[in-house]
Amino acid sequence: AYQGVEGSYGHGAALQYFGQDADVYHVKSMEDAMVEVEEGRADYAVLPIENSSAGAVSDNYDLLVKHNVYIVGETELAVNHALLGLPGATLEDIRQVYSHPQALMQCSQYLNSHRQWRQVSMENTAVSAKKVLEDADVTQAAVASEIAGKLYGLKVLQPSINYNKNNVTRFIILAK
């Protein structure tokens, strides 16, 4: 189990660790992923624990103490954020940018150079991409992977916007 939707970095980490044919599924929150393991519905949970640019994902450390799960493995995933918009959208159209708080932080130099853009935190990068597609509003953009952009039919308005070009997230694999 991983948090987010298909095309999220958690999804990518799960497939990287377990293989492309692995039976993986998504849940809404990091805590939900841990509960899936605790209650026996999933053998494993895949959660981000640390990023080379933004540091520790402290909420997940807190959840590790709260839940009866154990770290049984880890994998590192290269993270390369792009600014994604609807086909036909331009940078000049953008007014709101959606993404996970960690991704917004990792892209802060680029995003802050566009002061007119309102940054809106969401639970996941790929969820943000899906929202932009579903809302069909050219003033919206998402910070997510180019893979998520392709999956949800979005256009890359600006590739590689994270300030650390060697951006890596360490994911932990949890079991009961």
Locate each region found by the language model.
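Domain-level signature for soluble enzymes in the chorismate/prephenate branch of the shikimate pathway
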Residues: 1-176
